[in-house]
Amino acid sequence: MSKKFKMKRAKNLNGFSIIHDYVTPDQEKKLLKKINESEWVVDYQRRLQYYNYRNELFEPYDLIPIPNKIPKYLDQLINQMILDKIIDQKPDQIIVNEYKPGEGLKPHFDRKDYYQNVIIGLSLGSGTIMEFYKNKPIPEKKKIYIPPRSLYIIKDDARYIWKHGIPPRKYDEINGKKIPRETRISITFRNVIKEKVKHDNIVYPKRSPN
């Protein structure tokens, strides 16, 4: 991760950047091993891991602190991103998502009222197409392929004007070639807006592991 890398900015999508091969295949393998050795919960019908904060699944969907602290191996990854000048503020919330082939993510904004501007994602195990949508002034859709081991940044217009999602399918078509999806692990790094955290809601029920 300390090697030289090139950050590419998406054309006509202000605020989206991507670094291909931010981690090596060996680093990817070690990260996946650490992740799969950690405890999962099942929300949204898929497996996840939450660290430091999460928003509840039930109204009023409070942003709450949780006892699961950011593990050392992810903290080391954060420190490397700071050394590489990708970020200048240490993220304080992480979500790890597992996506099986055929699973997707409906178009959405990351909560504008709970999280700060910069969202960082690291994709492991498989690539995927991420789609961006906006309705005004005219409907538009953009597709960006996220290869495995890539790190991407969503901020500014890409964060606040464009919704993003992942179409649910078992392969993606890139330059006329069908690329099968495999199990993909997505690590998302955010900074919470501290004033929005509900410290009086400290109930964090255990959900189904596995």
Curated annotation (Swiss-Prot):
Residues 90-193 form the Fe2OG dioxygenase domain. GO terms for molecular function: demethylase activity; oxidoreductase activity. It comes from the Viruses. Gene3D superfamilies: Alpha-ketoglutarate-dependent dioxygenase AlkB-like. GO terms for biological process: demethylation. This is Uncharacterized protein L905. It comes from Acanthamoeba polyphaga mimivirus (APMV).
